[in-house]
From Swiss-Prot:
Pfam families: AGT (PF11440). GO terms for molecular function: DNA alpha-glucosyltransferase activity. GO terms for biological process: DNA modification; symbiont-mediated evasion of host restriction-modification system; symbiont-mediated suppression of host adaptive immune response; symbiont-mediated suppression of host CRISPR-cas system; symbiont-mediated suppression of host innate immune response. It is an enzyme of class 2 (transferase). This is DNA alpha-glucosyltransferase. It comes from Enterobacteria phage T4. Interacts with clamp protein gp45. Keywords: CRISPR-cas system evasion by virus, Glycosyltransferase, Host-virus interaction, Inhibition of host adaptive immune response by virus, Inhibition of host innate immune response by virus, Restriction-modification system evasion by virus, Transferase, Viral immunoevasion. Catalyzes the transfer of glucose from uridine diphosphoglucose to 5-hydroxymethyl cytosine of T4 DNA to yield glucosyl 5-hydroxymethyl cytosine (glc-HMC). This DNA process seems to occur immediately after DNA synthesis since the DNA alpha-glucosyltransferase interacts with the clamp protein gp45. The glc-HMC modification protects the phage genome against its own nucleases and the host restriction endonuclease system. The glc-HMC modification also protects against the host CRISPR-Cas9 defense system.
Length: 400
């Protein structure tokens, strides 16, 4: 089949971009023709995070309507992974909506909703029109704001006596899959190459990524024990001002200054701003423990781990995840909480950091045990969210 993957918001370089690239790879691996198109009307800071330039096609929606229409109509299945942002010019959104109206009726339109909160959802333009053109819709959680707020606004269950009730379409749950085997084959190191004293956090400068807790854990436990902490992805955005105002000790480096980073004992947290994903994974694969401390509200959690969760387990470090995330997410295989399994993952409890630290000490002092536990974590994450299972599950829904 001919597939067109369209990012109408643009190439952000974060989760939606990663999803689109993983999706493209899976389709090609399974014998389909794929075109990857993205709008260039809005610029983003992380466009170099992933390799895409050799095959992706940029369009300026405000000026290249005919080019965009030809691309999205030259397929059997059109997958829309994002819609324009509220900050784009009027011509961009007008042409995007016009595009929706002129998609060939024969094309099956699939919409993935990657945002969680209603605040983020309302920063999109043309989302309702996109949903109404869709044949298949996916979201992360049955209880999230997309399902429970926006879909109910667009498809109210009660209307006036003079109107017919419009039945809401089904919204299917999805997980963002990753080729976990491929990541392992690229980055996994022998256990003898791992520096057990390096603790490496990855995320962004947004509080739900858990950077304050990582700073706290470093100062109270890791630093006194002579261990080092590196935090990758903390950009100097407006949110970073609060870190400075709180007087949190740190040393900050740009991506080109990484060789200057001080990984000696008894140092403050070492911060790296934007990272190149492949370079980060190489560094992570030689680090004793990798931290992904996202802490979303329970209503947004159903089955989906983030890509950074999966990357930690796939590259060969011991993953450390936020405990309540694991309590609320269900394992794909048996629908039980992730924390109920002997998974090899360390579950970070901000109310009991000492137990987290004791587990880190135990694994650091026994490389054979460490090796067994990271293999366990890899297998668990593979079964939970590998491309071979999850994209197949989604494709079966798309084509049924």
């Amino acid at each position: 089949m001919r597939i067109c993957i369209f990012m109408a918001r643009g190439l952000e370089g974060c989760g939606v971009t990663k999803f689109s690239l993983e999706q493209r790879d899976w389709f090609i691996k399974n014998g389909h023709e794929v075109t990857l198109v993205y709008a260039k009307d809005k610029s983003f800071t992380r466009t170099s995070s992933h390799d895409h330039k050799s095959f992706s096609i940029p369009v300026i929606l405000a000026k290249e309507y005919d080019k965009a229409l030809k691309l999205v109509n030259d397929c059997d299945i059109l997958i829309i992974n994002s819609v324009p942002a509220t900050s784009v010019q009027e011509a961009t959104i007008n042409n995007y909506k016009k595009l929706l109206d002129n998609i060939k009726p024969s094309i099956r339109v699939v919409v993935y909703q990657h945002d969680h909160s209603v605040l983020s959802l309302r920063r999109n333009l043309g989302l309702e029109e996109t949903v109404r053109r869709a044949d298949v819709i996916f979201s992360h959680s049955d209880n999230g704001d997309f399902n429970k707020v926006l879909m109910k606004e667009w498809y109210p269950e009660t209307v006036s006596l003079f109107d017919d009730i419009e039945e809401a379409p089904t919204v299917y749950n999805f997980q963002p899959p990753m080729d976990i085997v491929k990541v392992r084959s690229t980055y996994w190191k022998d256990v003898s190459e791992i520096n057990m004293n390096i603790n490496r956090w990855i995320g962004r400068t947004t509080t739900w990524k858990g950077f304050y807790q990582m700073f706290d854990f470093h100062e109270k436990f890791l630093k006194p024990a002579g261990k080092s902490t590196v935090m990758e992805g903390l950009e100097r955005s407006p949110a970073f001002i609060a870190i400075k105002e709180k007087g949190i000790p740190y040393e900050y480096y740009g991506n080109r200054e990484i060789d200057k980073m001080n990984l000696a004992p008894n140092q403050p947290a070492q911060i790296l701003d934007c990272y190149i994903n492949s370079e980060m994974l190489e560094r992570m694969s030689k680090s004793g423990f990798g931290y992904q401390l996202s802490k979303l509200n329970q209503k947004y959690l159903q089955r989906s781990l983030e890509y950074t969760h999966l990357e930690l387990g796939a590259c060969g470090t011991i993953p450390v995840f936020w405990k309540s995330t694991g309590e609320n997410l269900k394992f794909r295989v048996d629908n039980t909480p992730l924390t109920s399994h002997d998974s090899g993952i360390i579950w970070f409890d901000e109310n009991d950091m000492e137990s987290t630290f004791e587990r880190i000490k135990e694994l650091s002092s026994d490389r054979a045990l460490y090796d067994r536990e990271r293999e366990k974590a890899y297998e668990f994450l593979y079964q939970h969210q590998d491309s071979s299972f999850c994209f197949k599950e989604q494709f079966d829904i798309i084509t049924k």
